[in-house]
Amino acid sequence: MNNEIYLFGNICGDSDVIVDQLIENGQKFDLILTDPPYNINKDFGNNSDCLPLDDFINITNERIKKLKQVLTPTGSIIWFGIHNYICYVQVAMYNAGLFYRRMNIWHYENGFSRSTKEPATHYEPFLWFSNDKKKWVYNCDEVRIPYKSTERLKSPVKYHA
């Protein structure tokens, strides 16, 4: 592995239009990382977060089908969501023919909720799906976090490539 990162760049505009252009141009990506609107009924000025559930599910299905078209054969999609809607995204990924790798959690110390009537959420789930069932890229050494306390390990962990 050459440890190079290729940056496509920031693209501003309607992501649905942009993805259509990428499909037309034959662009392919090894990784798509997306953090789309969560449909949590908040007013961000464009109604993208206030859809009826059926519309949210249909739009999510269409977006994932399009994103699959711009994945390389060994490419992956990482999709951030919110706990009460991520299940619909997961089903859409399966329906698009993608393969489940993991659901992980992004944990943060300070939650986003300003509510005093319920606990703040201190995490966001994200899904990792690949385009191929047996071949995908995952560079574990680059993302591995060392143990904070090695004293609790009875024997060193050995990884085999």
Regions from the PLM with identified roles:
Residues M1-A161:
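Core catalytic lobe of class I
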